[in-house]
């Protein structure tokens, strides 16, 4: 259907579904954009869905495996989800910042050690999952994820798909954008703190306009998961990315005004991309030219402009107002800043940044080599490795394919159409990711577009709707939509890796550090975790040790006193993959997973006298129902 043709619904009611969504978005932003996007599209406005034969490329037959792993942020569910691509089948959920009843994450002693002091928070808001790299390629060792809600960053071991470290970032609020050092390997995890706060933030002032109100750019040591350094910036920080040399990182800023309301944050016609020179930051720290803030010992370097002069470690590149996504092209040539309130994307030539820092360029805008007009509400850009970029247009509800080289030519004044195609998506897309797109191996096979609204695409589920993650075939010249995938609240982003890049364990290693502290506790008690079924009392603290082998626990009953603090430690002796056991103490809020060769423990108070049954919560055997026992609690 062309734009000029009205549907019967439009004739009757004035607006169709797409028109309503577009009008709603434009109400809040069109006046701020100030210009319509130009450029032609190869296909029309209506979604180009793949035919049946083409859709079969995304079908994975029963018993067959997907070509890619996909790791989805779980948004404010606080978890990470693992999907197979292209089937879009959910394979696993990895609890991170949330409490998970199925596995006992947030309840077990092992998970509480990982959560540390932040275990007091029962929520999280995951946005940006990223896989560790070596030489610009995924090495499959770790996945890192941010928590915007409680200013944390977590690391997930991909061999066992479990979170093993969490760090709370000091001196900041709301960790949002997160990216990794790509070469020579992931030594740093870079993350943006979004909101400006006063320093010290102790209630002595609420003024955010002065020099003592700011936010910081943060670098985390990927191995120790300790904050290595921080950089004070002008304005705020949104999204970030790293180059392929290890020297430059860049972040978008949408609040250069340091405003506290919507109108104020959109006042300036230009905001900026701030570029960080990583070796220069390290040199400043080595030379002791840093401060610390509050009780934190993290080195803090000042990256703000002073008296019109740049700092040694940062440069600020003006771009159209309120930019959002920041993406590095897989050839290492460009940082792409997505306009959001401008219909443009700004292409920053990474090779010119050295001259910018050296003072050889008169204007920081001299590093800009392209600024294509793409459509309304460009948010994020991904790449196919063949010289094309794909940008989500939130207001237009489209994915636009455009050519990087042609956009550069157009910026120089040539009459060239850089737009290859526009594809309707459903509806209001945010992040998008192509297969291997954040590495030098981008292969241009699939794109996942994470659309924020599903509206009428699925069976109704009441007032709360799922989001819609759409799979698009980009292997040919034309983009083709092949799959709609409903997702629960609220994935922001995903990352896609080849299945051969992720090496998982089938059963636990008995020497695994995940439960090493629990093993040490048992050794101190003289317990052999592979055979002993014993109860150790130390005052009112009782430690219950048992083994399990489907379909039985090593102890079918144990006795404690009312008010005792009870720690149950179980070791699963099964050596066959997928024979996971569980432990639930009825009416005590106690549940945990014990996978093959794993040791798990959980602590609770036996506050009710009487007989209390426990059972295996995972169906591990035909006699699963009989796998149970009793805690006998003597009245105090």
Curated annotation (Swiss-Prot):
Positions with biased composition (Basic and acidic residues): 302-312
Pfam families to which the protein is assigned, alphabetical: COX2, nos_propeller, nos_propeller_2
Keyword annotations from UniProtKB, A to Z: Calcium, Copper, Metal-binding, Oxidoreductase, Periplasm, Signal
Catalytic reaction(s) noted: N2 + 2 Fe(III)-[cytochrome c] + H2O = nitrous oxide + 2 Fe(II)-[cytochrome c] + 2 H(+)
A GO CC annotation given for this chain: membrane
Binding site for Cu cation Z3: 128, 431
Domain of life of the source: Bacteria
GO biological process terms on file: denitrification pathway
Binding site for Cu cation Z4: 492
Top EC class for this record: oxidoreductase
Enzyme Commission number(s): 1.7.2.4
Pathway where it operates: Nitrogen metabolism; nitrate reduction (denitrification); dinitrogen from nitrate: step 4/4
UniProt cofactor note: Binds 2 calcium ions per subunit. Binds 6 Cu cations per subunit. Each subunit contains 2 copper centers; Cu(A) (binuclear) and Cu(Z) (tetranuclear). Cu(Z) is thought to be the site of nitrous oxide reduction.
PROSITE patterns: COX2, COX2_CUA, TAT
PTM comment: Predicted to be exported by the Tat system. The position of the signal peptide cleavage has not been experimentally proven.
Signal peptide as annotated in the record: 1-49
Binding residues for Cu cation Z1: 324, 380
Entry binding sites for Ca(2+) 1: 452, 467
Cross-referenced InterPro entries: CcO_II-like_C, Copper_CuA, Cupredoxin, N2O_reductase_N, N2OR_C, NO_Rdtase, Nos_propeller, NOS_propeller_2
Record: residues binding Cu cation A2: 616, 618, 620, 624
CDD domains found in the cross-reference section: N2OR_C
Family: Belongs to the NosZ family. In the C-terminal section; belongs to the cytochrome c oxidase subunit 2 family.
Subunit organization: Homodimer.
Protein name from the UniProt record: Nitrous-oxide reductase
Source species of the chain: Pseudomonas aeruginosa (strain ATCC 15692 / DSM 22644 / CIP 104116 / JCM 14847 / LMG 12228 / 1C / PRS 101 / PAO1)
Annotated gene: nosZ
């Amino acid at each position: 259907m062309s734009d000029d043709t009205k549907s019967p619904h439009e004739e009757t009611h004035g607006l169709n579904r797409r028109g309503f969504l577009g009008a709603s978005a434009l109400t809040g932003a069109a006046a701020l954009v100030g210009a319509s996007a130009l450029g032609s599209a190869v296909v029309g406005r209506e979604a180009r869905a793949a035919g049946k034969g083409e859709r079969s490329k995304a079908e994975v037959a029963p018993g067959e495996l997907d070509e890619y792993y996909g790791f989805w942020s779980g948004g404010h569910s606080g978890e990470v989800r693992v999907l197979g691509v292209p089937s879009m089948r959910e394979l696993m959920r990895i609890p991170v910042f949330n409490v998970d009843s199925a596995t006992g994450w947030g309840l077990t002693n092992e998970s509480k050690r990982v959560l540390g002091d932040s275990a007091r928070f029962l929520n999280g808001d995951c946005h940006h999952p990223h896989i560790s790299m070596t030489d610009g390629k995924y090495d499959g060792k770790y996945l890192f994820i941010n928590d915007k809600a409680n200013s944390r960053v977590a690391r997930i071991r991909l061999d066992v798909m479990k979170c093993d470290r969490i760090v709370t970032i000091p001196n900041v609020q709301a960790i949002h954008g997160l990216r990794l050092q790509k070469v020579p390997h992931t030594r740093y995890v870079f993350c943006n703190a979004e909101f400006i706060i006063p320093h010290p933030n102790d209630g002595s002032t609420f003024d955010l306009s002065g020099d003592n109100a700011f936010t910081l750019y943060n670098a985390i040591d990927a191995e120790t998961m300790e904050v290595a350094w921080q950089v004070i910036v002008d304005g705020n920080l949104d999204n970030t990315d790293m180059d392929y040399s290890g020297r430059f990182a860049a972040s978008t800023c949408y609040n250069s005004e340091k405003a506290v309301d919507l109108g104020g944050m959109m006042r300036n016609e230009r905001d900026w991309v701030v570029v960080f020179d990583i070796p220069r930051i390290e040199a400043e720290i080595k030379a002791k030219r840093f401060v610390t803030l509050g009780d934190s010992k993290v080195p803090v370097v000042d990256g703000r402009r002073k008296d019109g002069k740049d700092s040694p470690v940062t440069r600020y590149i003006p771009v159209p107002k309120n930019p959002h996504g920041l993406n590095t092209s897989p050839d290492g040539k460009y940082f792409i800043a997505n306009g959001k309130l401008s219909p443009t994307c700004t292409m920053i030539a990474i090779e010119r940044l050295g001259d910018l820092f050296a003072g050889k360029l008169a204007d920081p805008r001299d590093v800009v080599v392209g600024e294509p007009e793409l459509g309304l509400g460009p948010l994020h850009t991904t790449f196919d490795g063949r010289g094309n970029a794909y940008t989500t247009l939130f207001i237009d509800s489209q994915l636009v394919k455009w050519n990087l080289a042609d956009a550069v030519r157009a910026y120089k004044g040539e009459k060239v159409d850089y737009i290859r195609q526009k594809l309707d998506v459903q509806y209001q897309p945010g992040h998008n990711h192509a297969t291997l797109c954040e590495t030098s191996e981008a292969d241009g096979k699939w794109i996942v577009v994470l659309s924020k609204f599903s509206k009428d695409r699925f069976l109704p589920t009441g007032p709360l709707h799922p989001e819609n993650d759409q799979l698009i075939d980009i292997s040919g010249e034309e983009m083709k939509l092949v799959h709609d995938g409903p997702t629960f609240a609220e994935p922001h982003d995903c990352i896609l890796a080849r299945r051969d890049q992720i090496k998982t364990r089938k059963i636990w290693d008995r020497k695994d550090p995940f439960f090493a502290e629990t093993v040490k506790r048992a050794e101190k008690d003289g317990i052999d975790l592979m055979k002993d079924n014993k109860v150790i009392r130390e005052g009112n603290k009782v430690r219950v040790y048992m083994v399990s082998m489907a379909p039985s626990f090593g102890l079918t009953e144990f006795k404690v006193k009312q008010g005792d603090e009870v720690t149950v430690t179980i070791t699963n002796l099964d050596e066959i993959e997928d024979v996971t056991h569980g432990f639930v103490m009825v009416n005590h809020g106690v549940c945990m997973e014990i996978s093959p060769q794993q040791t798990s423990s959980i602590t609770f108070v036996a506050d009710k006298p009487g007989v209390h049954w426990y059972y295996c919560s995972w169906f591990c055997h035909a006699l699963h129902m009989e796998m149970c026992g009793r805690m006998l609690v003597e009245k105090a």
